[in-house]
Amino acid sequence: MPAPIDDLECAALDVASSLELTSLAMKQCADRLRSNSTTFKSALRLLIRTADRPGSKIVFTGVGKSYQIGKKLAATFTSVGTLSICIHATEALHGDMGVLVPGDCVIALSYSGATEEVLRMTEHIRMDKRVCVVGMGRSSDSPLGALCDAWIDSAVASELSDSVNAPTCSSSLMLAIGDALAVLLMNRRQFGPADFARNHPGGHLGRSASQGAM
């Protein structure tokens, strides 16, 4: 049985503390990036090269929560001008790797760096040097890191719960890094309100973008 919430004020403060912990994870990642960006710049170089090459695309992959993050990021990248898709690593091993073409860049999402399906997919990609792989997760010193051309550090000190190690801070950080990359590529290509209005005509965002482009 769930424990009764006797004190809603305490519950609200618990949520506030969780938000602060998530924010701290992002700040710590930003601090690491400011102090040493060498590895990150290698990943940026590959992503920019892919985004600038006509016909090439950025392909996110993962399983579980990482796959859900990849789907969201692929949608964001595409909506702001960088062609992107997301494929499930398991489905990739059963035919979906056919979407990869020379010049693509795969962003493999695995916080542990040891997700079996992602490793198998990456190993298969490594047989074809015409597609590069950027990993994102806790440590480049991992089975996935050893297979990648570049690595994006998304390590966190802890998740929100000490007892249940569900992806929380780590998944939020992955998402935030991906959004930041999408905006970086958007700004490089001078993608503006008129471009966004063409890609996103529906809903409140579409109406606002259309008005801003006038």
Show where each model-derived region lies:
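An N-terminal, well-structured beta->alpha segment
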Residues: 2-52, 56
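Glycine-rich phosphate/diphosphate-binding loops and the adjacent beta-loop-alpha structural elements
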Residues: 11, 49-59, 201-214
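Short, basic/glycine-rich phosphate-binding loops at helix/coil junctions
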Residues: 18-25, 73, 77, 213
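Secondary-structure transition/hinge residues
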Residues: 30, 34, 185, 189-190
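Aromatic-residue hotspot detector
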Residues: 40-44, 86, 196
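Glycine-rich phosphate-binding loops that contact phosphosugars or nucleotide phosphates
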Residues: 48, 52, 57-189
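Internal, active-site/partner-interface "lid" segment
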Residues: 146, 160, 187-214
